[in-house]
Regions:
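NTP-dependent small-molecule kinase module
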Residues: 143-149, 154-215
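Conserved lysine of the Walker
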Residues: 16
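Extended, compositionally biased repeat/scaffold regions that form elongated interaction surfaces
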Residues: 206-286
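A glycine- and Lys/Arg-enriched "phosphate-lid" helix/loop adjacent to the NTP-binding pocket
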Residues: 95-168
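Conserved substrate/cofactor phosphate-moiety recognition/catalytic segment
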Residues: 24-71
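Hydrophobic positions on the alpha1 helix immediately C-terminal to the Walker A/P-loop
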Residues: 19, 23
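Glycine-rich phosphate-binding loop used to anchor ATP phosphates in small-molecule kinases
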Residues: 59-122
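P-loop (Walker A) phosphate-binding loop of NTP-binding proteins
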Residues: 11
Length: 286
């Protein structure tokens, strides 16, 4: 059986990336994952064609198309038990629905792109967990103030209210199969993890679910590992990656460290680069 895809999506502050980090540490070689899409880490022909909001939205839509195609290939890898994605097309559509930025791509245009181009390319089994958080809780969890100027829009209360409305009322109808909706207000990370583990158990991944719930939680916000420091800085540092969310962990013969907006990978030969499952399968160590 091909590996299922688990998508984690929802408004900022819902705990998606923290949950992904716990899953990556717990499941190790049995999983491949996609970090949150990040146009800032793309370059050359892969970069956005125009710096406008519409240009960036088109980049995200095309990225989701490429990712859907890659996931179909990666799901066939016998070494992979589970693929995990921090956001998918829902994140792009949510932004188009909620933003009031000038020169933004119309929501209907983005939705039609999903229906015509992305949906037919999705893998056989896509499980979706929508993590909800109220606007007030979203702001509180993230300290109420943007750490960097470019993140300021994600602290706008009106935007957060519209995102919450999208994920509550609209997003479930845009999932390949009915999603599991988890309200994280007042919930502990262990409670949310247990609900996601239940999604996997219901899909037949009992052993994977047990590994998740039995794994010890690691300390949040670990330091950047020195082996990744140079590449982290060269590719944009905090502005591009955000903060580290896992320590350096062994993965299929190499080492990876997951950050908020990307991950870095060091292969067995000592080459360090951006973690990018779109490029080629990451094989288990011989």
């Amino acid at each position: 059986m091909n590996a299922p895809v688990l998508v984690l999506d929802g408004p900022p502050g819902a705990g998606k990336t923290s949950l992904l980090a716990r899953m990556v540490c717990a499941l190790a070689d049995d999983t491949l994952w996609f970090t949150e899409p990040n146009a800032r880490l793309s370059c050359g022909l892969a970069a956005p064609v125009h710096p406008s909001p519409a240009g960036h939205t088109l980049w995200f839509l095309r990225h989701e198309l490429d990712k859907s195609r890659a996931m179909r290939r990666l799901a066939c890898d016998p070494d992979t038990r589970l693929l995990i994605s921090d956001r998918n097309h829902l994140g792009v559509l949510a932004y188009c629905y909620a933003t009031r930025a000038e020169d933004s791509l119309p929501y209907r245009t983005a939705r039609d792109f999903y229906a015509r181009r992305i949906a037919p390319e999705l893998p056989e089994t896509v499980l979706t967990a929508i993590l909800l958080v109220s606007p007030d809780q979203s702001l509180t969890r993230r300290g109420n103030v943007a750490e960097l100027p470019r993140w300021k829009q994600w602290f706008d209360e009106g935007l957060l209210e519209r995102l919450h409305r999208f994920y509550t009322d609209i997003a479930p109808s845009l999932c390949p199969t009915p999603p599991t909706v988890i309200n994280t207000d007042g919930a502990t990370p262990e409670t949310v993890l247990a609900q996601v583990a239940g999604v996997l158990a219901d899909a037949g991944l009992d052993q994977t679910a047990r590994r998740l719930t039995s794994a010890t939680a690691r300390a949040p916000r670990p330091p950047l590992d020195p082996q990744f420091a140079d590449t982290y800085a060269q590719l944009g540092g905090l502005e591009a990656f955000g903060h580290p969310f896992t320590p350096a962990i062994a993965h299929r013969g190499g080492t990876v460290q997951l950050c908020q907006l990307g991950a870095l990978h060091r292969d067995p030969a000592g080459h360090t680069r951006l973690w990018n499952p779109l490029a080629a399968p990451v094989r288990r160590a011989a």
